[in-house]
């Protein structure tokens, strides 16, 4: 409901189609999404300060990784970011704690990312945002998934990574 109202100024036709097919509150004008009041406050949607701080840390780490990815790309060690295996090493327990439970490979848009020493021959650099961080970038190992382009050591017979294989198993008609 609220998202439809928020996106209406930039996606008016799409939001109006959604609006026409959804149930409405008594205070809504059901004729068109643009005939309704926008929510006055976004405070109800704000994340807690500690969550914002955590994601700020994760995004700064991503900036550090992207800098090393660009250098590795310029040095022709990798082509696309999805062809990269990233290693992270730090003495900061706070930085590791902020990244706990976060899929850093997904956040950094690389095939694999883990907390370990850089591989031999990897592009290695210190973090700009986190000088105590060492980022290593090397070529990802494994088979390139034809569906998501991630490289995986656990590809199935069709070459699909485990994640894509799981998704495709739910839709056997598409296989």
Predicted regions and their residues:
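Generic detector of well-ordered secondary structure
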Residues: 71, 147-150
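Flanking scaffold residues of small Cys/His-coordinated metal-binding clusters
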Residues: 140-143, 155-156
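A glycine-rich helix N-cap at a beta->alpha junction
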Residues: 102-118
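Residue-level signal for well-ordered alpha-helical positions
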Residues: 21-22, 99-102, 151
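Acidic, turn-prone loop/beta-hairpin segments
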Residues: 1-68, 72-92, 96, 114-117, ...
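Short functional micro-motifs and their immediate structural scaffolds
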Residues: 150-156, 169
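Short cysteine-rich clusters marking metal-coordination/redox-active sites
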Residues: 145-148, 161-164
């Amino acid at each position: 409901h609220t998202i439809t109202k928020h996106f209406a100024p930039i996606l008016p036709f799409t939001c109006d189609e959604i609006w026409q097919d959804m149930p409405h509150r008594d205070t809504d004008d059901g004729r068109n999404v643009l005939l309704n009041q926008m929510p006055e406050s976004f405070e109800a949607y704000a994340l807690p300060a500690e969550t914002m701080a955590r994601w700020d840390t994760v995004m700064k780490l991503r900036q550090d990784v992207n800098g090393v990815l660009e250098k590795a790309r310029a040095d022709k060690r990798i082509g696309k970011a999805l062809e990269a295996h990233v290693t992270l090493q730090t003495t900061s327990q706070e930085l590791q704690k902020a990244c706990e439970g976060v899929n850093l490979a997904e956040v950094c848009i690389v095939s694999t990312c883990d907390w370990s020493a850089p591989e031999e021959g990897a592009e290695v650099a210190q973090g700009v945002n986190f000088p105590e961080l060492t980022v290593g970038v090397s070529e990802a190992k494994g088979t390139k998934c034809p569906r998501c382009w991630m490289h995986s050591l656990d590809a199935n017979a069709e070459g699909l990574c485990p994640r894509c294989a799981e998704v495709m198993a739910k839709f056997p008609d598409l296989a």
